[in-house]
Amino acid sequence: GPMGPSGPRGIPGPPGAPGPQGFGPPGEPGEPGASGPMGPRGPPGPPGKNGDDGEAGKPGRPGERGPPGPQGARGIPGTAGIPGMKGHRGFSGIDGAKGDAGPAGPKGEPGSPGENGAPGQMGPRGIPGERGRPGAPGPAGARGNDGATGAAGPPGPTGPAGPPGFPGAVGAKGEAGPQGARGSEGPQGVRGEPGPPGPAGAAGPAGNPGAGANGAPGIAGAPGFPGARGPSGPQGPSGPPGPKGNSGEPGAPGSKKGEPGPTGVQGPPGPAGEEGKRGARGEPGPTGIPGPPGERGGPGSRGFPGSDGVAGPKGPAGERGAPGPAGPKGSPGEAGRPGEAGIPGAKGITGSPGSPGPDGKTGPPGPAGQDGRPGPPGPPGARGQAGVMGFPGPKGAAGEPGKAGERGVPGPPGAVGPAGKDGEAGAQGPPGPAGPAGERGEPGPAGSPGFQGIPGPAGPPGESGKPGEVPGDIGAPGPSGARGERGFPGERGVQGPPGPAGPRGAGAAGIPGPKGDRGDAGPKGADGAPGKDGVRGITGPIGPPGPAGAPGDKGESGPSGPAGPTGARGAPGDRGEPGPPGPAGFAGPPGADGQPGAKGEPGDAGAKGDAGPAGPAGPTGPPGPIGNVGAPGPKGARGSAGPPGATGFPGAAGRVGPPGPAGNAGPPGPPGPVGKEGGKGPRGETGPAGRPGEVGPPGPPGPAGEKGSPGADGPAGAPGTPGPQGIAGQRGVVGIPGQRGERGFPGIPGPSGEPGKQGPSGASGERGPPGPVGPPGIAGPPGESGREGAPGAEGSPGRGDRGETGPAGPPGAPGAPGAPGPVGPAGKSGDRGETGPAGPAGPIGPVGARGPTGPQGPRGDKGETGEQGDRGIKGHRGFSGIQGPTGPPGAPGEQGPSGASGPAGPRGPPGSAGAPGKDGINGIPGPIGPPGPRGRTGDAGPVGPPGPPGPPGPPGPP
């Protein structure tokens, strides 16, 4: 609730009896006098010299030129490379600490100009620019060694459905019916007319699907635009608050100091001093802390596409690539529609069997009839003639692999092949385990005082003091008088000698007074014994990178890290020189007749043929594309000193100056009449809180801090940044002979086998009844040319063997030079050259007219000293003083857990290929592939002789 009214002032008590004369100890020396008011502030010193600009990023290292590849399709001009980022500008040095303000003296000398800050450190090295665009293709080099077989490309698209299969073979003849009774000899019948043609044959089985060839690779697409820079990620959560510190030991009791008196009215400013002479140039300040690197600039806008350049000379035709792997098996074609069944004809009268006519040509197979009911089993027929040998059946399943033969005597080593290219460096392995902590080193010498730290934020308010055990008596407030005018502060009196210490009061301890001013720093005490190792503090933020230290002595080799993952299989080495022939082995036993062998691998390429004739001159190419934007030019040389400047024109008249400072105090005026003593007015309302006082001058450097205790284990570090690009790997060691490979996967279906040889003719058997129709015979010699048949369905594409690549002809004569292309855009201007020395100063122009002096204000009469006002509200806590020198470093804490492994650094340049290893022993041959598709039906053989007449048929129905 609101404060109640003040009670009446109590009657003062009787004076106490004087106590016995005490002889107290001599009083402590008085507090030093308060600092006088701050003198007028000198003019600000000239600004410190800006740090030199950081070096521009060096251009990226040009990549090694790869072997000339085959002439590819003309690519779309790429966008211009992003220039390297310019180094960040170093920070200006931190100004030296400001000296303590001296007592107010007579007219203040103007302050010397501030020291120039030391030039900032060189900015970090710029990010190397992106790799430049490759130059125009050079002339065709000599034919390189055959490259390693490329990895299998993706499966080609499913080929179209193969052509319809060939008509199926004539089905086997049905079993012979029962032997009928021989009929009586009938009359010679009239030869009947030929019956109607049989119904159309059923569609043959679906042909095997054709092997679709791999489609040609598509043209490379145009490079996409660079993606927009992603938004900045959200700020991570704040770390957990550190543990609350232990309370410090209670400080020594401070000297008894009276409460500070009321703040005097600030006196009028003294007259401005004359401009002092320019001070000597100060020594350079300490090196500024390097600033953090700025954000990486976004990608530049895409340049305009250049016009087509002049076509270069046509390069030699590249070697024909190896055939790609067979595409996936196509889906089987749809079965053909069965033909419509013919209308059965009326049954004719059974005629007498006629004489057998000549064998007609085999008609197309009829449609499959409906399943008939099985007839009664007939008597066994006579043994038929030996049939013609059928086609060889499909290959049987692969037998169990034989036991591995003993390892042969190693042949003489082949000639050392040419050094292969450096293999690519493997990905950066995970960090090895942390080594054991080293022994604690000897304490180093005290470091130099650190830079003046930026004043920290105001600390939290201290804990309030504990109240006394017994509260003191509250005095009765007196009636408040009228507040008089505030007078000028009187001159400070001479401090009197300290009085004898009075007896200790009987009352309870009062509330602790406000904290006294900080005393002068005492002499540095001797180093105390090291305290116990404290708990390790939370790891602080990473400081700015310090300057590079001197290279240390080479340390002992650490323990070997864990073995890295097995690298990718290297490219096969060049084929070695053929070794000398080995000794002839013993003759082996004759082997059994083997199956027809699979198609052999294509032979080695033949000798290089003679060079072909020179090709005709190529056509005139279109104008070439606009050249790339030129790289920034080198830094210009330092310019020479310029000529002295001409005499400047007289300056314009200066502005009217501000009113001059107040003049000296005039003689004191006659004393005015004494006014009547006014009655005390009511107590005024409490005024608003005064604004916080100005920040006081920085305090003197604090004493050196105590030796810090080792901090606690820090939390796991954040994932490291990508490691630097790995160095080129060393040349590989000659590999050991490879182990025997595991059993390979089943091979792909082999090509169609060649037709087997014609079997020998069978022996003539006894003439029996006509046997069932045998399988189609092997194609006989070609008969006479028949009439031209209707065009058949398109066959599946054949696969011929790859021909040898002919030698590349010499490059054709260069075409006529094309029209000059348009002028490329102007390159970026080079870095600004170093500033030349300043030329001699020109003559000083005439001084402008001085403005009129402002009127001097009259000095007022000195007012009467008013009553002491109420104590103002406690001001804000002042800013922290200058940071004291850094204490001796604490004992190193235990090593925190290793941070998460950073992402793998960029892939290093390929290391040199090792010498080719020895040929390993051949693995176990894979199982035999499935049989190939059936070969095409051969041409019809010649018509055979007429067969013997068959037996008479059974009698017809009555």
From Swiss-Prot:
<protein>
    <recommendedName>
        <fullName>Collagen alpha-1(I) chain</fullName>
    </recommendedName>
</protein>
<feature type="compositionally biased region" description="Pro residues">
    <location>
        <begin position="943"/>
        <end position="958"/>
    </location>
</feature>
<feature type="compositionally biased region" description="Low complexity">
    <location>
        <begin position="304"/>
        <end position="335"/>
    </location>
</feature>
<keyword id="KW-0272">Extracellular matrix</keyword>
<feature type="compositionally biased region" description="Pro residues">
    <location>
        <begin position="808"/>
        <end position="823"/>
    </location>
</feature>
<keyword id="KW-0677">Repeat</keyword>
<feature type="compositionally biased region" description="Low complexity">
    <location>
        <begin position="100"/>
        <end position="116"/>
    </location>
</feature>
<feature type="compositionally biased region" description="Low complexity">
    <location>
        <begin position="347"/>
        <end position="373"/>
    </location>
</feature>
<feature type="compositionally biased region" description="Basic and acidic residues">
    <location>
        <begin position="859"/>
        <end position="873"/>
    </location>
</feature>
<feature type="compositionally biased region" description="Low complexity">
    <location>
        <begin position="216"/>
        <end position="232"/>
    </location>
</feature>
<feature type="compositionally biased region" description="Pro residues">
    <location>
        <begin position="154"/>
        <end position="166"/>
    </location>
</feature>
<comment type="subunit">
    <text>Trimers of one alpha 2(I) and two alpha 1(I) chains.</text>
</comment>
<keyword id="KW-0597">Phosphoprotein</keyword>
<keyword id="KW-0964">Secreted</keyword>
<feature type="compositionally biased region" description="Pro residues">
    <location>
        <begin position="769"/>
        <end position="779"/>
    </location>
</feature>
<feature type="compositionally biased region" description="Low complexity">
    <location>
        <begin position="382"/>
        <end position="401"/>
    </location>
</feature>
<feature type="compositionally biased region" description="Low complexity">
    <location>
        <begin position="892"/>
        <end position="925"/>
    </location>
</feature>
<feature type="compositionally biased region" description="Low complexity">
    <location>
        <begin position="557"/>
        <end position="571"/>
    </location>
</feature>
<dbReference type="InterPro" id="IPR050938">
    <property type="entry name" value="Collagen_Structural_Proteins"/>
</dbReference>
<feature type="compositionally biased region" description="Low complexity">
    <location>
        <begin position="685"/>
        <end position="694"/>
    </location>
</feature>
<feature type="compositionally biased region" description="Gly residues">
    <location>
        <begin position="294"/>
        <end position="303"/>
    </location>
</feature>
<dbReference type="Pfam" id="PF01391">
    <property type="entry name" value="Collagen"/>
</dbReference>
<feature type="compositionally biased region" description="Low complexity">
    <location>
        <begin position="584"/>
        <end position="614"/>
    </location>
</feature>
<keyword id="KW-0379">Hydroxylation</keyword>
<feature type="region of interest" description="Disordered">
    <location>
        <begin position="1"/>
        <end position="958"/>
    </location>
</feature>
<dbReference type="GO" id="GO:0005576">
    <property type="term" value="C:extracellular region"/>
</dbReference>
<dbReference type="InterPro" id="IPR008160">
    <property type="entry name" value="Collagen"/>
</dbReference>
<feature type="modified residue" description="Phosphoserine">
    <location>
        <position position="560"/>
    </location>
</feature>
<comment type="function">
    <text>Type I collagen is a member of group I collagen (fibrillar forming collagen).</text>
</comment>
<dbReference type="GO" id="GO:0005581">
    <property type="term" value="C:collagen trimer"/>
</dbReference>
<feature type="compositionally biased region" description="Low complexity">
    <location>
        <begin position="640"/>
        <end position="656"/>
    </location>
</feature>
<feature type="compositionally biased region" description="Low complexity">
    <location>
        <begin position="704"/>
        <end position="728"/>
    </location>
</feature>
<feature type="compositionally biased region" description="Low complexity">
    <location>
        <begin position="139"/>
        <end position="152"/>
    </location>
</feature>
<feature type="modified residue" description="Phosphoserine">
    <location>
        <position position="92"/>
    </location>
</feature>
<keyword id="KW-0952">Extinct organism protein</keyword>
<keyword id="KW-0176">Collagen</keyword>
<comment type="similarity">
    <text>Belongs to the fibrillar collagen family.</text>
</comment>
<keyword id="KW-0106">Calcium</keyword>
<feature type="compositionally biased region" description="Basic and acidic residues">
    <location>
        <begin position="50"/>
        <end position="64"/>
    </location>
</feature>
